[in-house]
């Protein structure tokens, strides 16, 4: 369960949230344009999966802003070249539009996913859900945050305490 809280006092989060909020707005505008029947470009990648102008626009935006924020970290993007990224030990992993098929079928079940990978582990991640106007943010081994764009409010996940001495009854 998420409980209302203050904004995290974390410079990493405070710099990334506005960048992701702008990317989310770009993606939402692209989606609204597409659903309204506006001009929209959809192509096929080499693996026959679709890539839209929304994928590419959000990808360009985030690549630019991540390079400004953390110039020392390369970005492994779903829309990028694998051969250049094989040996990276630390990088951003980006999917600028996770759920392209849902987007194309006008289902609002798509996200922007951004993770910081160190070694072989995700140490930080943000998942933005444009149509819900929320973002989930977390560090490895810490409770995640939720940010509501529309209400401009922060929430932190709270683990409910259970009485371990009371057995859990399952079934009849």
Residue ranges and their predicted role:
Residues 68, 108-111, 142:
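Residues in and immediately flanking transmembrane alpha helices
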Residues 1-97:
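N-terminal subdomain of lithium-sensitive/metallo-dependent phosphomonoesterases centered on the IMPase/IPPase/PAP
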Residues 75, 92, 112, 170-171:
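Well-ordered beta-strand positions enriched in small/hydrophobic/aromatic, beta-favoring residues
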Residues 90-131:
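Glycine-rich active-site/cofactor-binding loop and its immediate structural neighborhood
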Residues 84-85, 101-104, 135:
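Conserved protein kinase catalytic core
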Residues 25-26, 101, 127, 140:
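Charged/polar positions on well-ordered alpha helices
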Residues 114-172:
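Acidic beta-strand-loop-alpha-helix segment within the catalytic core
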């Amino acid at each position: 369960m998420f409980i209302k809280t203050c904004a995290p006092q974390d410079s990493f989060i405070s710099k990334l949230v506005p960048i992701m909020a702008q990317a989310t707005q770009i993606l939402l505008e692209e989606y609204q344009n597409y659903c309204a029947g506006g001009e929209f470009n959809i192509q096929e990648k080499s693996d026959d999966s679709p890539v839209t102008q929304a994928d590419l626009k959000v990808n360009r935006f985030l690549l630019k802003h991540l390079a400004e924020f953390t110039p020392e970290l390369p970005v492994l993007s779903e829309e990028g070249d694998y051969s250049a990224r094989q040996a990276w030990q630390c990088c951003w992993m980006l999917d600028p539009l996770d759920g392209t098929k849902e987007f194309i079928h006008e289902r609002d079940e798509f996200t922007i996913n951004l993770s910081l990978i160190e070694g072989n582990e995700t140490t930080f991640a943000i998942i933005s859900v444009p149509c819900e106007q929320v973002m989930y943010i977390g560090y490895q081994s810490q409770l995640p945050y939720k940010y509501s764009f529309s209400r401009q409010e922060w929430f932190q996940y709270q683990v409910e305490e259970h009485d371990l001495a009371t057995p859990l009854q399952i079934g009849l």
